[in-house]
């Protein structure tokens, strides 16, 4: 489902009685407001369920222990300075860019096929993770490559691109619609809006509970084809 289809679904259903909709469409001037609510609802769902897992490759250098996982350190942003190798350690390409979308790190392996302990200060192979997008190696004596697998965030949807795809499993769209409707109604001060916001929040909670109890949830994994690539070797 793309963003326009989501807006139309809401306008024909859970927010159809509001002044921001007309003839089954969200009025143009209110589209940013509804898109903001959709983004918040998606963020909520991604925090509850492991919707997507991805991986990023990080090249370690002797003498460096801290590695912020941000795109400013990616290979595709290197400008050819002398210190490129030291400052640009995230291995990506323009075709497969790192998108600054780390929600939480799941596991870490190195190019010797070792699973690295996380947040274990007693292990020389341990990787400390004080922040979701920062890793600290315990020992920086050799040149290694890490594959960091992580739960990914959904990219922020823009009201300027209504063709953007909403990346959710089909069975989560009901929760998305209910939580979005809850946010929009709760932003209004009428008695009817307050009652509707409570109704849609309860509806959202019921859907989430049912999914957690009855639906096996496997994340959309985008890590299986990742290979360790380092300047000419795999």
Q: What residue spans do the PLM features occupy?
A:
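Glycine-enriched, solvent-exposed interface loops adjoining structured elements
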Residues: 1-234
